[in-house]
Amino acid sequence: MLAACRPRPPAPLVPVPLAPVERDSAIAWARTTLPPTPTAIRFRWHYQDEHVKYAGRGTARIAPPDSMRFDYAGPLGLGSGAAVVIGDSVLWADPDKNFRSLVPAIPMLWAALGMIRPPAAEADVLGADLTDAGGAPRRVVWRFAQLGDTLDYLATDSAGRTVLLEAEWRRRGERVARSRTSLDARQRPASARIDFASGGARFELTVVAIDTATVIAPVLWRSRR
């Protein structure tokens, strides 16, 4: 009886079979999601799981094509930290545990900020255009799969631009995290949320400003310790 009351796991983001596509096409698409110049994205954030709730402000400084300095702070400076991400790897984080608790899935952080990491060299690349003839918004799907990990991306277009970017990470068939990002008229992130399967965790952010003329000082890439 108890088993019957358990909530069903969410359906896959992309519940349809996909065909292999050229890797170069996926790389070209991922490149279009990056800012053309170093950019600072300032946001309000909220995190909660089964045990805690936190909120505060943060800044993601992006140096395309693959580098990010991520700073966050809670109310009155409590719970502050920083990290540098290169591609899908954390170069350093301080405090390490706090950052990895806040954002345990780096590809999903990039996706939440409206940016897609290109497929790894050994990844299988699949895709589809789900546009139908009924006048519905165009939806384009990409899947990058390797070594038991699968990353699905679903981009919804309207009036010739992407307005919604969704992503899902599955490991050995089990969902790890799913993100949903609304984009503004310039296809930049406006708001986002990442839901994690473990512990009912959720990370949300609302963008308050985007500076496309920012200068990222070299010292910011170095560890704070």
For the regions a language model picked out, list residue spans one by one.
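Amphipathic hydrophobic-ligand
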Residues: 52-56, 79-84, 173-177
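Hydrophobic lipid-interacting interfaces of membrane-associated proteins
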Residues: 44-50, 75-78, 90-97, 145-147, ...
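Edge/loop elements at the starts and ends of beta-strands within beta-rich repeat scaffolds
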Residues: 32-39, 51-54, 61-66, 83, ...
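N-terminal leader/targeting segments and the immediate start of mature chains
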Residues: 5-55, 63, 67, 102, ...
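Gly/Pro-enriched, hydrophobic low-complexity segments
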Residues: 128-225
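An acidic-aromatic
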Residues: 64-120
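Surface-exposed beta-loop interaction hotspot
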Residues: 116-133
